[in-house]
From Swiss-Prot:
Enzyme Commission code: 2.4.1.315
Keyword Lipid biosynthesis: yes
NCBIfam families attached to this UniProt entry: PRK13609.1
PANTHER family reported in the protein's UniProt record: MONOGALACTOSYLDIACYLGLYCEROL SYNTHASE, MONOGALACTOSYLDIACYLGLYCEROL SYNTHASE 1, CHLOROPLASTIC
Keywords linked to the UniProt accession: Carbohydrate metabolism, Cell membrane, Glycosyltransferase, Lipid biosynthesis, Lipid metabolism, Membrane, Transferase
Broad enzyme group: transferase
The protein, known as: Processive diacylglycerol beta-glucosyltransferase
Catalyzed chemical reaction(s): a 1,2-diacyl-3-O-(beta-D-glucopyranosyl)-sn-glycerol + UDP-alpha-D-glucose = a 1,2-diacyl-3-O-(beta-D-Glc-(1->6)-beta-D-Glc)-sn-glycerol + UDP + H(+); a 1,2-diacyl-3-O-(beta-D-Glc-(1->6)-beta-D-Glc)-sn-glycerol + UDP-alpha-D-glucose = a 1,2-diacyl-3-O-(beta-D-Glc-(1->6)-beta-D-Glc-(1->6)-beta-D-Glc)-sn-glycerol + UDP + H(+); a 1,2-diacyl-sn-glycerol + UDP-alpha-D-glucose = a 1,2-diacyl-3-O-(beta-D-glucopyranosyl)-sn-glycerol + UDP + H(+)
Physiological role: Processive glucosyltransferase involved in the biosynthesis of both the bilayer- and non-bilayer-forming membrane glucolipids. Is able to successively transfer up to three glucosyl residues to diacylglycerol (DAG), thereby catalyzing the formation of beta-monoglucosyl-DAG (3-O-(beta-D-glucopyranosyl)-1,2-diacyl-sn-glycerol), beta-diglucosyl-DAG (3-O-(beta-D-glucopyranosyl-beta-(1->6)-D-glucopyranosyl)-1,2-diacyl-sn-glycerol) and beta-triglucosyl-DAG (3-O-(beta-D-glucopyranosyl-beta-(1->6)-D-glucopyranosyl-beta-(1->6)-D-glucopyranosyl)-1,2-diacyl-sn-glycerol).
Length: 388
C-alpha cells in the first residue's frame, strides 16, 4: 500500500480548460487526503517561446486561422503515427526527466495530450502508472499510447471509438470530464436572481463572450436581442475589458434588457438561471452546461475538437449549432419561444452528464495504486503512441 502518494499532473495553457481540469483533479485528491499534488505546465516550462507562439496561433484559430487549424487537427490525425510522433514525443522531455528525478512522483496524470511520459516509460522501462484524462467529447489519436495505463473519457461514444482503433476496453473508464465542484452543488435560485438583478418572470439568454474575442459581433447581437420582449440578455466578457466597456455603453440604453459582466468566478450561478446559452463548444464548458442541464447554442465551432464536440451534442439533441452569422438571431429567438424544445434539450443535457467525474477518476487511480487515504469533508463554496 502506498501511503501519501505523490501525484504529478501535467497540463498546458491552450485555452483554460486543460488547466482547469488539472486543478479540479488536484482539489479532488486533496479531498481524499492526498496533499502532495504537483500541477505542471510541461510545455510552457520547457519551451516558453515556442509555447507562446503556438498559444497565439491557437487563439487566432477562432478568427483568421480556421483553415490552418483544420489542416493541423485533421492532418496530424492522419499522419501522426508516421511523422509527428517522434518529434512530439520528445517535446518537453528534458524538463520531464528533471521533474521525475527531483519530485519522484508515484502517479502521473495528463490533462493535455502529452506523450513524453509514456514514451519515456517505453524507452527507459521505468515503472510509473500513467493516466490520460481526455477533455473533449471526441478522440484525437495523439492521446493514445501503449504505455498509458488508463484513459478516462467523457462518454461511451469516445470509449467505443478507442476500442475500434485497438485500445483494450479494460483500459478505458467512462467518467465524464472533471468540472468545478460549484457545478455539482444545489443553490437557491432566488439569491442568484437578486444578486445579478435578473427577473424570474423573463427568459434569460446567457452569452459567454470570453476573453479572447472568440464570439464575433457581440455588440450587434446584444442590440438585436434587446428588442425582444420579455427577454433579458446576460453577457459575460471574461477578462476582455475592451468588450465590457463597449457593451456597458449599450447597456445604458436599456439596463433592464441587457446585463454586462466581466470575469465571474462563480459563473455556475448564471448557468442555473439561464434559459439557454450561446457559447463555444469547448469540452469543459459543455460538461458544465450538461451538469446544470443548460440548453446551448454553439456558435461557429472551429474545425477540430470544437466542431466534433458540437456535432456530438447536436446529434444528442442537446445543442443547436450555428455556422453562419445571419442565422444566429432568428434561430436563437425561435428556440427561446419554443418551451417544448428547450425542455427536450435540458433532458438531453441531463442524459450526457456523468456525476462527480473528478471524484470517480481519483477513486479509480487510488484504488489501482492501493493508496492509503484520509477523507477530508468538503465545505460548500459560498454563493458569490498507437495500438494500430
Amino acid at each position: 500500500m502506498i501511503k501519501n502518494p505523490k501525484v504529478l499532473i501535467l497540463t498546458a495553457h491552450y485555452g483554460n480548460g486543460h488547466v482547469q481540469v488539472a486543478k479540479t483533479l488536484e482539489q479532488a485528491f486533496h479531498q481524499k487526503g492526498i496533499e502532495d499534488v504537483i500541477v505542471c505546465d510541461l510545455f510552457g516550462e520547457s519551451h516558453p517561446v515556442i509555447t507562446d507562439i503556438t498559444k497565439y496561433l491557437y487563439l487566432k484559430s477562432y478568427t483568421i486561422g480556421k483553415e490552418l487549424y483544420r489542416l493541423f487537427y485533421y492532418g496530424v490525425e492522419k499522419i501522426y503515427d508516421k511523422k509527428i510522433a517522434s518529434w512530439y514525443a520528445n517535446f518537453g522531455r528534458k524538463r520531464l526527466k528533471a521533474l521525475l528525478h527531483t519530485e519522484k512522483p508515484d502517479i502521473v496524470i495528463n490533462t493535455f495530450p502529452i506523450i513524453a511520459v509514456p514514451e519515456l516509460k517505453k524507452q527507459t522501462g521505468f515503472s510509473i502508472p500513467v493516466y490520460n484524462v481526455l477533455t473533449d467529447f471526441c478522440l484525437h489519436k495523439i492521446w493514445i499510447h501503449r504505455e498509458v495505463d488508463r484513459y478516462f473519457v467523457a462518454t461511451d461514444h469516445v470509449k467505443q471509438v478507442m476500442i475500434e482503433i485497438g485500445v483494450p476496453a479494460e483500459r478505458i473508464v467512462e467518467t465524464g470530464i472533471p468540472i468545478r465542484k460549484n457545478f455539482e452543488l444545489t443553490m437557491n435560485s432566488e439569491l442568484i436572481y437578486n444578486k445579478y438583478q435578473l427577473s424570474r418572470e423573463k427568459k434569460i439568454l446567457l452569452i459567454v463572450a470570453g476573453a479572447h474575442g472568440v464570439l464575433g459581433n457581440v455588440k450587434d447581437l446584444c442590440a438585436s436581442f434587446m428588442s425582444v420582449p420579455n427577454l433579458q440578455v446576460a453577457v459575460v466578457c471574461g477578462k476582455n475589458d475592451a468588450l465590457k466597456q463597449e457593451l456597458l455603453k449599450l447597456q445604458e440604453q436599456n439596463s433592464e434588457a441587457l446585463k454586462v459582466f466581466g470575469y465571474i468566478e462563480n459563473i455556475d450561478e448564471l448557468f442555473r438561471v439561464t434559459s439557454c446559452m450561446i457559447t463555444k463548444p469547448g469540452g469543459i464548458t459543455l460538461s458544465e452546461a450538461a451538469a446544470l442541464q443548460v440548453p446551448v447554442i454553439l456558435y461557429k465551432p472551429v474545425p477540430g475538437q470544437e466542431n466534433e464536440n458540437a456535432i456530438y451534442f447536436e446529434s444528442k439533441g442537446a445543442a443547436v449549432v450555428i455556422r453562419e452569422d445571419a442565422e444566429i438571431f432568428e434561430k436563437t429567438k425561435a428556440l427561446l419561444e419554443d418551451d417544448r424544445k428547450l425542455l427536450q434539450m435540458k433532458e438531453a443535457m441531463g442524459s450526457i452528464y456523468r456525476p462527480e467525474p473528478a471524484a470517480h477518476i481519483v477513486d479509480v487511480i487510488l484504488e489501482e495504486n492501493h493508496a492509503q487515504t484520509n477523507h477530508v469533508p468538503m465545505k460548500s463554496p459560498a454563493l458569490a503512441q498507437s495500438f494500430t
